[in-house]
Amino acid sequence: MVKVALKAKNLLRILARKNKSQNWLAYRMEISSGYMSQLITGARRPSPKMRERFLQVLDGVAFDELFEIRESNGRKR
């Protein structure tokens, strides 16, 4: 099984470069700030729909810059 994880450090760098906050991103993605926090800390993994929203809201950011694909055994692909 393949899992997709958010690269939280990269996301935070991207937000800093854009001078935007996690709350701004949560608002633009139409999710709660609590859910955004869970995505960033790794408590939750982004669904395909959430991944699509990240890429739409953070226009110009590549998939591989934000997400990491892992096999169920934890290895990176």
Each language-model region and where it sits:
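Short, basic-rich loop-to-helix N-cap that marks the start of a DNA-contacting helix
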Residues: 43-56
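Short alpha-helical "recognition helix" segments of helix-turn-helix
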Residues: 25-26
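A short, Lys/Arg-rich alpha-helix, primarily the initiator
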Residues: 1-21
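Recognition helix of helix-turn-helix/homeodomain-like DNA-binding domains
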Residues: 31-45
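Short, Lys/Arg-enriched C-terminal cap helix and immediately downstream tail that follows
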Residues: 11, 48-49, 63
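Short, charged recognition helix plus adjacent turn
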Residues: 1-3, 33, 64-77
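Helix-turn-helix DNA-binding elements, focusing on the entry/boundary residues of the two helices
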Residues: 22, 33, 51
